Structures are given as C-alpha cells and as structure tokens.
Amino acid sequence: SFDELPSIIERLQKSQISQPTKLALEFLILSACRTTEVLNAHWSEIDLNKELWIIPAERMKSSRRHEVPLTKRMVEILEEAKNIKLDNNLIFPSPLNGRPLSNNTLRLALQKRLKVPATVHGMRAAFKDWAAETTNFANEVSEMALGHAISNKVEAAYRRGNLMAKRRQMMEEWMQFLSGHDAKIVRLQIKKVTL
C-alpha cells in the first residue's frame, strides 16, 4: 500500500544498493513513470530551465510525447546521477556495460534487497491509489501524470492541454508524502456571496 512508501524510500536511500540502481528506483517512484521510460531516460530529454523531463512519443506506450514535471528531489537525483555519467547519453547507465539498467535490476533491488513484496510497476499503482484516496485532484490529473491515453474519444478530441500546473502541484505533494513530510495542502473553494 502507498502508506509504506515513505519508509521504503528511506530504506532505499540508506541501502548499499549500487548508486545508479538506487537513483533510478527513487526517480521511478517520484515520477510515477514506467520502468522502461526511466531506464532509457536520456540527458537530452531533461530541460532543467523548465523543470521538465520530456519523454519522446516513440518511448511512450501511448505513442504520445509525455512531459513530466521535475520536483526538487528529482532534480537532486539528476545532479547525483551526473557524477556517474558515462560517455553515453543515459541518465541511469549500468556500471557494468554502460547500457540501460535492466528491469530485473530494479525488481531485485526492490524485492530482494529491500524485502518489499511488490513489483516495480506496483509503484505506479501506489501513486494512483495515493492520488485517489488522499488528494482532491481530479482523476484525469493522475491519469495524465501516469501518461495514460484518454480512452474517451470525445474527451480526447477536445483535450488540448496537459494540465501541467495541476500535475506539477500533484507531484510536489507526492514528493512531500514520500519524504515523510506530508504537507497537507488544503484547497478552499470560496463562493462569492452577494448581498
């Protein structure tokens, strides 16, 4: 369940797991992205000025470009990853061969090293549950954060924006939750009263 994630993150950060694996797994949890999206992330996809990770359409399951807002902790992870940068463009290269880390590497880190009885993909489900159960964000905000295609054809035809401001706020709250500093941000709806 998502309640356990702050302690999992803390254990991950203190673990003796290799630095690329540790950083990739935390980045995956913070971004709520798919394993292959994170493991194949390239430096050329990062725009620190706009605080965005721009995943090209050809790497997305939905075949649509996906923009992921970078939180403060995600930027810190990227700074740490620069120290292990090899001659290629990968953010999280395998220290053994410079190629992307394998899906199995993250699975073993989570299940064997951290003793978490969950899949890496289950981290995305935990994000979705957290968003649904503890926030007031509309369902489509978390769906867009997960990079899901809009299944309703009419809505898809009219949806032009990517809800970036709301997604950025959601991901900041997710980061706060994961860090154990769950700053509950209360959103008030003020009704205009005329006398």
Where are the regions a protein language model picked out?
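Short, polar N-cap/turn motifs at the start of nucleic acid-interacting alpha helices
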Residues: 45-52, 116-117, 136-159, 180-186, ...
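Short, contiguous acidic/charged loop-to-helix segments that flank catalytic cores in large enzymes
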Residues: 12-16, 57-67, 93-99, 114-120, ...
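Hydrophobic, well-ordered secondary-structure elements that form the walls
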Residues: 70, 128-131, 142, 174
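Basic, Lys/Arg- and aromatic-enriched nucleic-acid-binding interface segment
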Residues: 1-41, 49, 60-64, 84-85, ...
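Active-site/catalytic core of tyrosine-dependent DNA strand-transfer enzymes
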Residues: 1-6, 50, 69-121, 126-127, ...
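C-terminal secondary-structure termini that scaffold catalytic or DNA-interacting sites
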Residues: 2, 72-88, 93-98, 150-153, ...
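Short alpha-helical segment immediately N-terminal to, or the first helix within
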Residues: 27-28, 130-134, 145
